[in-house]
């Protein structure tokens, strides 16, 4: 990636990873990603975050091309896709100081073995004067990790927001040119990474609303010249508002649960409810996570394997529980051959959800006409609950 000018004193010196398809050995990356790092030039020069260690060579080449001496590295976040090249930068610039907060210092020392004497510690509201330019540090715990912070370039009104407001999107565009292009990756990123911290994010959005910000420069994806484009979407996603939607992760072994799912989908459609089914044997978990951002209800469908739920259903329940979406209702449908505790175990897997659990539907063998009536009753109950929310 070439060096790109953000403002008169800010340069993007990070890396685009066009080929990466999995993050944290967990999150699919259908659109690749980028690791954004920024140089702020003045009498002193600051490097804001670094890049994934697989791309260290690109970062170092960009710094050499700019012909700068790095006086300060600002570490907004300790995760290695942003901090992993810090050791190489410290090695290249021996007098460089590593500027971060106390919690981030601890993590960086533990994860990257950085010597304590390299650190310069800042707290919320502290500033670093580079010359004519001033960096202000804003603590943002649990917008992602407990040590996350933002850096604000006062004179040019640039917010370096780290992972917050980012998107896993490999693009040659420095700035968002078409919101339609970035909406899906940004929402997917929020769903997979940020949604568990919804309550904390609300507070940090209020902080940003009180600031004069002209450019949002995240650590992944393109930058925003109109910050309200991305903050407005986040305000919607973190609100308590839900939509007339049911998310339906399912798996079926011999067709019984699939027959229930197909009937349930039809019953929901007949009642004017949007349904989003995900066959867990092939589903993209990022798409499943995205669907949970807005939905009022989630229903997991599973057969019984030995005495418990199918492992794919367990994974779906664990994912829903970990992401803690704002859905209001949940239920379980499925089948069994001779017994088991499928429903009970799935319930236990979703204890983080602050939802009303609607009566599950569990059938023995292939569903009968009476079983389909029970599924219709569940669809009726969901319709009623959604109407009570004016959906």
What is each of the regions a protein language model found here?
Residues 3-65, 150-153, 157-160, 257:
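Conserved beta-strand hairpin/beta-sheet module of binuclear metal-dependent hydrolase folds
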Residues 4-8, 100-148, 200-203:
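Metallo-beta-lactamase
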Residues 43, 54-99:
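Active-site metal-binding motif and surrounding structural segment of the metallo-beta-lactamase
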Residues 48-50, 70-78, 98-101, 159-162, ...:
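Active-site neighborhood of phospho(di)ester-bond hydrolases with catalytic His/Asp-centered motifs
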Residues 85, 284-288:
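Short acidic active-site motifs
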Residues 144-148, 164-196, 237-242:
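Active-site-proximal loop/helix segment associated with metal-binding centers of metalloenzymes
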Residues 171, 181-216, 221-222, 263-276, ...:
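FMN-binding flavodoxin-like domain, especially the glycine-rich phosphate-binding loop
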Residues 249-271:
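Short, charged N-terminal beta->alpha structural module
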